[in-house]
């Protein structure tokens, strides 16, 4: 078993990927796993260089806002929930001093109502 000596200097996107591997692989359905992996891909796109110990409320809110610029509110809420689980564990581990997800404002594009229905 390999552990990181100084996790506080770890990139948040790397911590999140490791967290998925440890806590989610083999415990959730493949469709749900895909959602966690998509969240990881968005972290790489939006905050590739963010050190985990630098994640604060303002940085987290900016991350959500950037994600919300391209997604509907419910999708942004799902993204937030996927990240929050890992972030709360990082707080418990002492890697982040305070919960940056506290009082987060969830934004997003309005629901466009375009649901694709197929006939059986």
Positions of the model-derived regions?
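N-terminal compositionally biased, intrinsically disordered segments and leader/signal-like regions
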Residues: 4-5, 119
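Secondary-structure junction/capping motif
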Residues: 11-15, 99-102
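Flexible interdomain linker/hinge and immediately adjacent N-terminus
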Residues: 61-65, 92-120
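Short, structured interface segments
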Residues: 1-4, 103
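N-terminal core-binding DNA-recognition domain of tyrosine site-specific recombinases/integrases
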Residues: 5-9, 13, 20-88, 92-95
């Amino acid at each position: 078993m390999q552990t990181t000596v100084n996790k506080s200097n770890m990139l948040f996107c790397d911590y999140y990927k490791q967290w998925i591997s440890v806590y989610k692989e083999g415990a959730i359905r493949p469709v749900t796993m895909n959602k966690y992996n998509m969240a990881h891909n968005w972290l790489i796109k939006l905050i590739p260089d963010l050190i985990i110990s630098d994640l604060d409320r303002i940085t987290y809110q900016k991350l959500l806002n950037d994600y919300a610029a391209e997604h509907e509110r419910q999708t942004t809420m799902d993204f937030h929930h996927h990240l929050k689980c890992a972030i709360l564990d990082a707080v418990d581990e002492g890697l982040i001093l305070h919960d940056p997800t506290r009082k987060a404002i969830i934004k997003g594009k309005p629901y466009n109502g375009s649901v694709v229905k197929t006939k059986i």
